[in-house]
Amino acid sequence: MNLIPMVIEQTNRGERSYDIYSRLLKDRIIFIGTGINDDIANSVIAQMLFLESEDPDKDIHLYINSPGGHVHAGLAIYDTMQYIRSDVSTICVGMAASMGAVLLAAGNEGKRFCLPNSRIMLHQPMGGAQGQAADVEIHAREIMKTKERLNQILAHHTGQPVEQISKDTDRDFFMSSEEAQKYGVIDDVLKRPPENS
């Protein structure tokens, strides 16, 4: 059962109730709290585009608690983060794994955070193919290209050499918040909200 909390806000016209995500959006907060698929990506992208159109000079705060998900859905969010004029601050609460970790690292420099007990996990993309041998070979080449692209993205945002990223992501690579800061995935471990929130 998926229960979305409602919040009630007093206005000069009386009470108004919002689902919690709509209320957070008013404060320029987007929350990814599940695996990343096309529906989640479309929702996050639409919210980013809306917030950019409202005020491109104000930061967007992307909170992440995600086990990862579909690479191409995640890359659609990533590309949007890089495309919009608003800075995107990323904050890991709980877990940022796989594509979630890529999005965490992709926040604007100096604005990537996690909470003290967060866990970050990097690894290579997973895939599977069946069918004719030629089709399986095509899919294998495609996943290798995707792996190389993700390694380049992580190298760009963390400052680590591509070779190091490739070595570390060969298997599941878990990090504490402090380790993620040293690695370059985040800029700081938060004990309180960022100043400009």
Curated annotation (Swiss-Prot):
Broadest EC class?
A: hydrolase
- Keyword field: Cytoplasm, Hydrolase, Protease, Serine protease
Q: Tell me where it mainly resides.
A: cytoplasm
Q: Which InterPro entries match?
A: ClpP, ClpP/crotonase-like_dom_sf, ClpP/TepA, ClpP_His_AS, ClpP_Ser_AS
- EC number(s): the record gives 3.4.21.92
Please give the Gene Ontology molecular function terms for this protein: ATP-dependent peptidase activity; ATPase binding; serine-type endopeptidase activity
Pfam hit, one: CLP_protease
UniProt key word Cytoplasm: yes
Q: Where in the cell is it found?
A: Cytoplasm
Q: Which Gene3D superfamilies does the entry link to?
A: 2-enoyl-CoA Hydratase, Chain A, domain 1
Q: Which CDD domains match?
A: S14_ClpP_2
Reactions this protein catalyses: Hydrolysis of proteins to small peptides in the presence of ATP and magnesium. alpha-casein is the usual test substrate. In the absence of ATP, only oligopeptides shorter than five residues are hydrolyzed (such as succinyl-Leu-Tyr-|-NHMec, and Leu-Tyr-Leu-|-Tyr-Trp, in which cleavage of the -Tyr-|-Leu- and -Tyr-|-Trp bonds also occurs)
Q: Which domain of life is it from?
A: Bacteria
GO BP annotations of the record are: protein quality control for misfolded or incompletely synthesized proteins
Q: Name one GO cellular component term.
A: cytoplasm
Residues annotated as the enzyme's active site: S98 (nucleophile), H123
Q: Does the keyword Hydrolase apply?
A: yes
Q: Which HAMAP family match?
A: ClpP
Q: How does it assemble?
A: Fourteen ClpP subunits assemble into 2 heptameric rings which stack back to back to give a disk-like structure with a central cavity, resembling the structure of eukaryotic proteasomes.
Family indicated by similarity: Belongs to the peptidase S14 family.
Outline what the protein does: Cleaves peptides in various proteins in a process that requires ATP hydrolysis. Has a chymotrypsin-like activity. Plays a major role in the degradation of misfolded proteins.
Know the name of this protein?
ATP-dependent Clp protease proteolytic subunit
In the UniProt record, what gene is named as encoding this protein? Answer: clpP
